[in-house]
Amino acid sequence: MKQYPIWNRIENLSLLGMPDLLGYNKNNQFFTVELKVVKGNKVRFSPHQIAWHKRHPKNTFILAETLVPSSMKTSSLSLFHGSSIMSLVRYGMKTTPIACDFVACALVFENLKAP
């Protein structure tokens, strides 16, 4: 029995801005995930990444891990729709995520269906 979602890491130098991961779930839906590590509030994107998410607003996501001081030994995950990239550019991690932990993020990906 297959475990879903299925992940593929994308290494692409010819298509600038392409997200880091391509996922596929049990509902036969493909989606992309841009991975970010954030210190503080600001999320850094290249102009190519911004353009990608503006051109492809459906089934695209941004997963940000916020690093905390090493004394706390934990980090937090936040998942955003790719269509919210301009809010992330402007407001950073103050943007409201659609999921805030690993389990909730996995449920978003597992439950994607055709429009």
Language model feature labels by segment:
Residues V38-P57:
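Mg2+/Mn2+-dependent nuclease catalytic core
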Residues Y91-P115:
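Charged phosphate-binding loop/patch that engages nucleotide di/tri-phosphates or the phosphate backbone
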